[in-house]
Amino acid sequence: MANVGFVGLGVMGSRMVKRLLDAGHKVTGYNRTKSKAQWLVDAGMKWSETPRAAAQAADVTFTMVTNTAALEAVANGSDGILAGLAAGKLYIDMSTVSPAASRELAAKVAAKGAKMLDAPVSGSVSTLEEGKL
């Protein structure tokens, strides 16, 4: 099983992490508000203090945040995902962001020698919990 990093543990992201844990994956997660993710830590997720540390611990890192500004906040800077990516790693963004923001981020990921997949999702919590997203 791959080591997974997950940044953005809101309504949808938290349910995705729960399904990954249930499938036996090792998940290191980060959320701006740690208390909202405590139930995932209790379920076996390892807590990360920064998005960078989540990416460093992972073979594949996911983001599921609300908008372009939120994505830029977790991706950039000395504690951002980009600082934790290394050559050969995979980054998958499932956030709702502009195509221009995705292209800009993909260029930064490529400069690190990593790969990026832009994979926005739509659906409901029940669809996700049923594994049909």
Residue ranges of each PLM-predicted region?
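Rossmann-fold dinucleotide-binding core
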Residues: 4, 65, 91, 97-133
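Short gly/ser/thr-rich secondary-structure transition/capping motifs
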Residues: 42-48, 72-76, 115-119
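Short, well-ordered alpha-helices that flank and scaffold nucleotide-derived cofactor binding pockets
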Residues: 18, 22, 76, 107
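Short, conserved loop/helix-junction motifs that constitute active-site signature segments
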Residues: 81-86
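Beta-loop-alpha module in the N-terminal Rossmann-like domain of NAD(P)-dependent dehydrogenases
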Residues: 61-79, 95-102
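NAD(P)+-binding Rossmann beta1-loop-alpha1 motif at the extreme N-terminus of oxidoreductases
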Residues: 1-63, 89, 94, 125-128
